[in-house]
Amino acid sequence: MHPAAEDSPLGKSSEYLDTYTPSLLFPIPRAPKWAELGLAAENLPYRGVDVWNCYELSWLLPSGKPVVAVGEFVIPADSPNIVESKSFKLYLNSLNQTVFADREALRQTLARDLSAATGAPVAVRLRSLGEVQEQGVAALPGQCIDELDVTIGRYGQPSAELLRCDPARRVEQVLHSHLLKSNCPVTGQPDWGSLVVDYHGPALDPASLLAYVVSFRQHADFHEQCVERIFLDLLRLLEPGRLTVYARYVRRGGLDINPWRSTGAVVADNRRLARQ
């Protein structure tokens, strides 16, 4: 478990406040998890973002009338901290009985508080329900590998040695799977996700990628670190011309987390999937 997570609200009973309380946000440093992967802030081999979507966001107008919206929060992947998810939920719930002059006043407040907690500029967008409905449900790009006939016997730890490629054949390819699962390192609760691998390089064997994805099934780690581990394992194997790895996780507590890691600039396509 991440040492800082032991002091977070995750896995503990909590009092739900309904008036604005920014101190509820609980930062967790990324550095210890980077160190586990042999990384440090000054030598990250990727660019990226973590996109959080909040479906339980409400506040009051000056008239006392409630408003609801869907919040989108984009956190840089090189920010010093992430925000522990339950503390994020508690913070957002503290807005429920708080008056804001208008939507922009709330957006600025959210951006200020989350930027302070993560140590980096956080972009905030508040979307109306009509906008979200119009956007609809998206399908992942590329080839789905989930129906491949493979025999799998490893579920405990991510196993990079399962991955195989053909160095003699270079391709542009997008593969995806809906079978990503890991466990919260604090509570042990399952984290369900869908994974996309978009690359240019030696042809990755799809069946080996599927076995590798499933090897995370009993692994305990945060969403962000799982995606970073996958990115690094593929980067080492393929030495690709370009590589983007991202996952869209099923929401819990009204929040879903969607980490993107890439060798190039990231433009996150933040459209929800059927399970989100």
From Swiss-Prot:
Task: Detail which positions bind NADPH.
Answer: 85-86, 252-253
Pfam hit, one: QueF
Keyword annotations of the record? Cytoplasm, NADP, Oxidoreductase, Queuosine biosynthesis
Query: Where does the record place it?
Result: Cytoplasm
Q: Name one GO biological process term.
A: tRNA modification
- The broad enzyme category this protein falls into is oxidoreductase
Protein function: Catalyzes the NADPH-dependent reduction of 7-cyano-7-deazaguanine (preQ0) to 7-aminomethyl-7-deazaguanine (preQ1).
Protein name, as recorded: NADPH-dependent 7-cyano-7-deazaguanine reductase
Q: Which organism is it from?
A: Azotobacter vinelandii (strain DJ / ATCC BAA-1303)
